[in-house]
């Protein structure tokens, strides 16, 4: 009887492990979208609404799910004008995403507005703070927002500690090439994330995913400074006429980041001209094929604001028409 029980327990353990593995692999690559503008669009005059192919008004996240989307990315600002992308606005969108079964990525900008390679302006409330204080600011901000989400039933899978930080963050203290301080800021965000969501993966995100030399320079220096990360994030906005070349260069960079640093990678942002939907679909199909060929270290591809009406906020790389219907671009998902 004892031998039988041992054998039974071994078989049961193997079956459970297989089921767990199947559950993980079943999630597959994240086919995502940053939809942070949604509530602001709904509050515009007239409100921007979304329609299915039959012309019926519906929720954009449901439209996205219906074409194969399975993940949502949301940016967070510190004290934004109008409240867009603050904690409450973010929670509302996160709840809508969770209701559709989406995995969620949070994108912390450490600013009251846009942060990108050309500007990394500190939040007004943090101006004049020392490096020690800024580290506390970063930790408290991320820990506070994430705990707020968790307390409201939201599971976060990935957390970006900064947005397109090729030139650093929280200028001037964290501006490159001051990697000693920049590494501290990144680690403060990393530690805050793990304190709330131990299993969430922390992303360090740069623009121009095709630029392998810049990625090597940045992550070599960050590693030397003791910076911590789980995932290297990349933005990818290829020109319509040469997207094949840019996809080639992006793949080369992804493979190198995986090999050089033992890191997962994710395409945090991608987009192309909304009027070139067929070409965008081809580009995305190719990008997903390359990502799947690389393997499980490529975690996902996130289209940036596909919900943007043409020209909304000056952005023309969305994936809906002027009637709020999806173009064919996202059929790649």
Please report, for each region that a protein language model flagged, where it lies by residue.
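N-terminal substrate-binding region of glycoside hydrolase catalytic domains
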Residues: 27-103, 109-138, 144, 160
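Sec/Tat signal peptide C-region and signal peptidase I cleavage site
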Residues: 22-26
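Bacterial N-terminal signal peptides
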Residues: 10-21
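Active-site cleft segment of glycoside hydrolase catalytic domains centered on the general acid/base Glu
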Residues: 86-89, 116-229, 240-252, 260, ...
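Hydrophobic faces of well-ordered beta-strands that scaffold small-molecule active sites
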Residues: 31-33, 72-74, 104-108, 157-161, ...
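Acidic (Asp/Glu)-rich catalytic clusters
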Residues: 27, 59-68, 92-103, 147-154, ...
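Aromatic-rich peripheral "rim/lid" segments of glycoside hydrolase catalytic domains that contact
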Residues: 43-49, 256-262, 274-333
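Bacterial N-terminal signal peptides that target proteins for export
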Residues: 1-12
